[in-house]
Amino acid sequence: MMSMEGPFLAAVIARLADPRFNLAAHGVAFAFALLIEAPVIMIMSASTALVEDRLSFKRLRAFIYGLNGIVTAFQLAILIPPVFRFIMLDLVAVPEEVADLAYWALWILLPWPGAIGYRRFFHGILIRDGRTRLVALGTGVRLVTMASTGLALFFFLQPPGAWVGAASLSLGVLAEAIVSRFMAESSVRKLLATEGVTADSVTGDRAGEELTYARIWRFYYPLALTSTIGLAAQPMMTFFMGRAIAPVESLAVFPVAVS
């Protein structure tokens, strides 16, 4: 279902003013948002594997809150105007018209990494509890919210297309995060009522041993590194296209092609 987001938003942006610049800015902003969220994207695997009682739930929840704060602060640092202009204009070398649109799109995408980490934490809890259908339901809520936001902005306000794409993605994932928390309520109650640690085929810890932050970090950092390396490809392609022939056209067609 999530694969429908890209083609839908590209179609909406292409029908608004200045589609060439806005498709390019949407692609640039989304590429950087993906890279920023990369460290939190594997939290679902961590919560599926590690959360088995009250203590492990609270420890991993605190860990993901801290990680969400770090990636959000990193995005805020990128949005400091001199830093942003250095990255976009000097390093990536995107045209200034594209950079200006991408700047505000990244502001609109500010809730994106934290909401991704939050909802994937609760997705893992749902999966561990065997309630996988609710994960699909949450994705459906995300798609409906994303599409409704995009269409409402298209028909009633018609802001720049890059901002429409960013707002649709942000509101969609925020809606999914909120719904996932409510859907996981009964699973969370069961975890909070469970004392002690049962064992662990995944981490290899001894039965009865607490899940410490050090163990969470040892388990999680290879996953975070894997997702960061994998998702770095799109920003790298943006870097090369910004310095290639016809950069605006290349940046505009790239999000359409990969969607």
Where are the predicted features?
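Residue-level recognition of transmembrane alpha-helices
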Residues: 27-30, 68, 106-109, 113, ...
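Hydrophobic faces of transmembrane alpha-helices in multi-pass small-molecule transporters and flippases
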Residues: 1-4, 106-110, 136-140, 179-182, ...
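Short runs within selected transmembrane alpha-helices of multi-pass transporters and secretion channels
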Residues: 41-48, 108-127, 135-142, 164-181
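Alpha-helical transmembrane segments of multi-pass membrane proteins
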Residues: 96-119, 259
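Small-residue-rich hydrophobic transmembrane alpha-helices
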Residues: 25-76, 119-127, 254-259
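Helix-terminus/linker motif at the lipid-water interface of multi-pass membrane proteins
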Residues: 3-24, 89-96, 154-158, 224, ...
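Short membrane-interface helical motifs at transmembrane helix boundaries
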Residues: 73-103
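Hydrophobic alpha-helical transmembrane segments
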Residues: 105, 138-152, 156-192, 196
